[in-house]
């Protein structure tokens, strides 16, 4: 009888995992396949001046743990400043956005899993395709993520992909 990846355990060394690097470095340390799609663990190293696009997840809970640096988290109507050692938990349906003036290294846990598919799809896009707001919105939606409009031209502020 074969043992599934979810039952055999996994070790992910520093810098090891599925790496998606565009504006920031995103490393998927534990994939959905490792957990029977229960959750996934992602490390993100954000450059100074980083700002994500405002978005929410339809089904997934998202939890952030800050390892280095700091970031401001807009969670619904509340703004939270998170420094090293801070943890921010966001339930499904709650719009959120992350901004870091000086850079931040954080761990993100998504439950259920599925966000890596968005990272992979966005990583495969050309720079011109990444600027196509409708295309990126559709890719995000396919992976449980709804972009929140922030400007009159329909484009969101910030990056869709770390």
Where would I find each of the regions flagged by the language model?
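Ligand-binding loop in jelly-roll beta-barrel domains
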Residues: 35, 72, 92-117
